[in-house]
Amino acid sequence: TLPKRLVVLGGGPIGSELTQAFARLGAKVTQVEMLPRIMIREDPDVSAIVMNKFREEGIDVLVNHKAKQFLVEGGRKVLVAEHDGRDVRIEFDAVLVAVGRVANTKGYGLEELGIPLAGTRTVETNEYLQTIYPNIYACGDVAGPYQFTHTAAHQAWYAAVNALFGMFRKFRA
């Protein structure tokens, strides 16, 4: 069932895509982002265009709002967010959390093999998606730089082709 009032935590591409989708389906959506703008990895102009479009479509976009806690008060669900040093209370019926992902690199023996991780906790690879060991490849969320399904599928093709046929195709992010 479509929630009447939806809070979306996160202003990245996935949070923004789902914000607009639910709003267009008829939910009253409030998007909460702790950074100064949504779509922070994009050019500021792109961010502004998306935010303005969302507001034209009736979406409440709250930037510089840091989610602190969820409460139930008198049967009502409330998100408490901090903005400019003050608490802001946002009532909602459902919440969608889209605040990013971290690659899961623990428990696979990468540390024991000495396979280095980048600062983003992704496996370091070369342009052929090989690690420091030419027979170990990484792709998808664990290889970065983007954590999208379509990127993972694209990288998987490159890694498989390179593993089977040698250094055949370079992946360019």
Model-derived features with residue positions:
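FAD-site-proximal beta/loop scaffold in flavoenzymes
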Residues: T1-K4, R89-M167
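Rossmann-like dinucleotide-binding cores of NAD(P)H-dependent redox enzymes
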Residues: P3-V7, P13-D87, P145-A153, V161, ...
